[in-house]
Every structure is written in structure tokens, then in C-alpha cells.
């Protein structure tokens, strides 16, 4: 499937010319190995894949014993995989490199040698056990691969033009008009319920069978649970608790993560490492409270007040509606036609978080629960900074609305209190684009353009 990260890989190859290795970090089943091998086939004369999920001891011994004799290292590697290596025309892929950290450490010597290019793929790249016995090489360029975004989903459905049409109307700030808006929302609802995991998207493209799509997503969720048991050593129970509680936490009105729902009188610090594990695995997107909308939202971050979104909304649906082990075709069709009588707010807010993350935004929100000052009490779903920072008006508050009837009490109070710091206030909703009273209302499918 066509992925935008391919252009990043091309840029790395052209700019670095072997001076760095490329590390692709991402959740399991997000398409890291596929994109690396697709790139290798198209852009190199030869390539080989060292898959550390099923590597032999003979190969791992090469990394341990032959870094001081790279001529022999490459000779053995070439013969073991029966692949001829061509100087500056061969790519060596180290797949799931976190499973053998010594191979990651060897990148320092392999890159310095300069004969070949290297792409590493992996997840959990920062977890202590994956880095504690190595020096992390400075010769790495690090990029993240997220689930497929809305435009990539459209490409998979053989629609190469709709996002360009949406982009044009976004830039001109003109409504899409009824027919095209309805068409875009139909595609958006498909994206919402299928999600962006490549295997799920492929199943949907091939069959349009929601039962099959759900089985694919459920297999991925089971893989994540198995990874928690296998790799979250020492705190696997807490990681599993958080993971299983995400739908219930997002179903609440405020959506802030309450650790007391996991255990009476539980505190953030007790679960901090477990949250970091899930974030590092890129299974979740963390969103932190920023107590003031100033330049540098991170400087005002309250890291103990947070929201925990699933990294893929399609997975969230399979995770949340799980009474009988599989989400029925009937339920999916109710979601598709906007007929399901549940609080869709958690799904819509989750996919906005997913799309903002894919666009490169760090996730922040604003929460003030003051009991003394009711005018200061407000909740803003997201805060994003504009791309070019100036001395004023840098932060856009975002409210996400899943229904047609809503109020903007918090947004209006927030705008009054922080007017000097704010860029354009935004409302993401199910209706068409409009501007009214200094607020820009955007259809949900325009979120990736922010």
C-alpha cells in the first residue's frame, strides 16, 4: 500500500548517502517491515533482511564476534542469506532490532565502514531492557511510522483525488457543499471504523466484510496482549490493567485517566512506568494537560493529568465492543450509517488524536476544574501550536463535536481569558466548513490539514 513515509526514506537515501542508518519505530503490525522491504526492492540492486524474530544463532554470533573484521562479517552474511552484496547498492534491513540490541549497537561500525545502507525497524526502542547494555549509536536517523492516515486510507480505496479537493477547500476556507461533504463524511466514517492498521485496511479493500476486518483487528489486539505479557517484565499486570481500561476511561465525559478506577487510592507514580511502556510501544497516544496556552505547551505540561487514547481508532472499536468476542457486522453497519445509539464522542475524539499525531502534533489539552472560580472552570479537548511561532497568537484551541447539537461554553470562556495568546479557535464537527464569530468550524475529515 502507498505510504507517505516512502518519501522520507527516499530523502534519507539521497541526503545521507550511507552516513547514517535509518531507524523506523512503530507499533507492531503498523507496516514497518513491509515499507522497508518495498523500498529495498524498488531502490536497491540487492537487499537482505535479518529478522530478529526468527534469526539463527549463527547470524547473531556474527554481530557479536566479527565487528572487528567486517570483510569476514559481510562474507558470512552474504553466504548465509545467499544474497550478493554490492557496495553502495545494497540495503541491509535489521528487522525488529530491539530483540537483539547488540545489532543496534553494531550500527556504529557498519555505518562507519560505508559499504552498504541500513534500515532498522522496531518497537519499544526506549525500554530499559532494550538499551541498558549498549551505547545507542549516534549514526541513526529516527522516524516514526503511525497507522495509515485518512489520505493513505483513501489511496488504498483507489481514491487519489478526494483529499486534494478537501485540501483546496481548506486552504480557501470554503465549504465543500452538500454532495461532496456527504461523500467525504462517508469515507471518513469508513476510516473511523476500519482504522489505519494496514492488514485491516487490506481486508476491507479486498472484501468489504466487517466480520473479517474485525477478526484481523482482534488478532492484532491479542498480539499486543501477548507482547505485554512477554516484554513488560515486572509490571505486566499494570500495563494490562491500563490497556484493558482505555475504552472505559474514554467513555467518560472528561476522558481524563483516573488511576483510582484501576485500584482504590492508586496514584500516577504507581503506574508511570506502565504508561511509558504503552506509549513507547506506540500502542497509545498520550495527551497531557497544559496549564496555560503559551509558546511551548510542554513547559506548562502537567504530566500527571492526562488522557490515554488508542493509537488506532479501528482497534479501539474492536477493543470496546467486545461482549461476545467479535464485533458484529450489524454493529459496524450501524456505525457506518451513523445509527448506533452510543456515545460516539470517545471514537471521534480518539480519531482526532490519531490524525493530529499522524500530522506531527504532540497532544495537549486544557483542563481547569476549579470549584471556587466557575468562570475559570473549563475543558478544551486539544491545543495545537501554529507552524510558524510569533510573539503572540500562537495556540489554537480545538473542540471536538460528534453530534449536530452542541454548545461551546468552554471554548468561549477560554477565548475570553486567553485572547492574546490564541490563534484561530477551531471546532471539528460533522457539518461543513464555516466561519462564525471568530471561530473556524471544520468538518472532521479536515483534521489532517491542521
Where are these regions (language model features)?
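Pre-Walker A adenine-sensing motif
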Residues: 1-16
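A cross-kingdom feature that marks ATP-driven nucleic-acid transaction machinery
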Residues: 13-20, 29, 38, 42-45, ...
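Hydrophobic anchor at the beta1->P-loop junction of P-loop NTPases
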Residues: 24
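Conserved lysine of the Walker
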Residues: 32
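Short glycine-rich substrate-engagement loop in P-loop NTPases that contacts/grips substrate
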Residues: 56-87
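Structural recognition of the conserved hydrophobic beta-strand(s) that form the central parallel beta-sheet
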Residues: 93, 117-123, 144
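Short regulatory helix/loop adjacent to the ATP-binding pocket of P-loop NTPases
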Residues: 109, 126-142, 154-159
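Interdomain hinge/linker elements that couple catalytic modules in large macromolecular machines
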Residues: 158-348, 354, 362, 368
Amino acid at each position: 500500500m502507498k505510504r507517505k513515509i516512502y518519501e522520507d526514506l527516499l530523502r534519507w537515501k539521497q541526503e545521507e548517502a550511507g552516513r547514517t542508518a535509518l531507524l523506523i519505530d512503530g507499533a507492531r503490525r503498523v507496516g514497518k517491515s513491509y515499507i522497508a522491504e518495498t523500498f529495498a526492492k524498488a531502490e536497491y540492486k540487492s537487499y537482505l533482511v535479518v529478522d530478529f524474530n526468527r534469526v539463527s544463532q549463527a547470524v547473531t554470533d556474527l554481530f557479536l564476534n566479527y565487528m572487528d573484521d567486517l570483510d569476514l562479517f559481510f562474507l558470512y552474511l552474504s553466504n548465509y542469506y545467499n544474497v550478493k552484496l554490492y557496495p553502495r547498492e545494497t540495503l541491509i534491513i535489521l528487522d525488529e532490532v530491539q530483540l537483539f540490541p547488540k545489532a543496534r549497537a553494531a550500527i556504529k561500525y557498519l555505518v562507519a565502514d560505508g559499504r552498504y545502507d541500513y534500515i532498522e525497524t522496531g518497537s519499544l526502542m526506549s525500554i530499559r531492557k532494550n538499551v541498558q547494555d549498549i551505547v545507542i549509536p549516534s549514526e541513526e536517523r529516527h522516524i516514526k511510522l503511525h497507522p495509515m492516515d485518512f489520505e493513505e486510507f483513501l489511496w488504498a480505496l483507489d481514491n487519489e483525488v478526494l483529499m486534494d479537493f478537501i485540501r483546496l477547500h481548506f486552504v480557501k476556507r470554503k465549504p465543500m457543499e452538500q454532495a461532496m461533504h456527504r461523500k467525504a463524511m462517508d469515507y471518513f466514517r469508513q476510516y473511523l471504523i476500519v482504522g489505519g492498521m494496514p492488514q485491516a485496511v487490506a481486508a476491507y479493500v479486498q472484501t468489504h466484510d466487517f466480520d473479517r476486518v474485525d477478526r484481523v483487528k482482534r488478532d492484532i489486539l491479542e498480539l499486543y496482549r501477548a507482547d505485554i505479557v512477554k516484554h513488560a517484565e515486572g509490571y505486566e499486570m499494570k500495563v494490562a490493567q491500563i490497556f484493558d481500561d482505555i475504552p472505559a476511561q474514554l467513555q467518560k465525559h472528561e476522558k481524563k485517566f483516573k488511576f483510582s478506577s484501576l485500584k482504590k487510592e492508586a496514584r500516577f507514580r504507581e503506574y508511570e512506568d506502565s504508561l511509558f511502556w504503552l506509549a513507547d510501544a506506540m500502542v497509545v497516544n498520550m495527551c497531557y494537560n497544559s496549564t496555560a496556552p503559551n509558546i511551548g505547551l510542554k513547559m506548562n505540561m502537567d504530566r500527571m493529568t492526562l488522557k490515554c487514547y488508542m493509537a488506532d481508532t479501528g482497534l479501539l472499536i474492536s477493543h470496546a465492543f467486545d461482549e461476545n468476542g467479535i464485533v458484529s457486522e450489524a454493529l459496524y453497519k450501524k456505525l457506518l450509517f451513523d445509527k448506533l445509539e452510543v456515545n460516539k464522542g470517545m471514537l471521534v475524539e480518539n480519531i482526532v488524536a490519531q490524525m493530529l499525531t499522524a500530522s506531527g502534533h504532540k497532544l495537549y489539552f486544557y483542563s481547569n476544574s476549579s470549584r471556587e472560580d466557575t468562570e475559570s472552570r473549563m475543558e478544551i479537548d486539544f491545543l495545537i501550536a501554529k507552524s510558524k511561532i510569533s510573539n503572540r497568537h500562537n495556540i489554537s484551541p480545538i473542540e471536538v463535536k460528534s453530534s449536530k447539537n452542541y454548545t461551546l461554553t468552554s471554548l468561549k470562556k477560554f477565548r475570553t481569558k486567553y485572547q492574546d495568546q490564541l490563534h484561530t479557535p477551531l471546532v471539528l464537527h460533522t457539518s461543513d466548513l464555516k466561519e462564525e464569530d471568530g471561530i473556524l468550524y471544520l468538518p472532521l475529515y479536515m483534521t489532517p490539514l491542521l
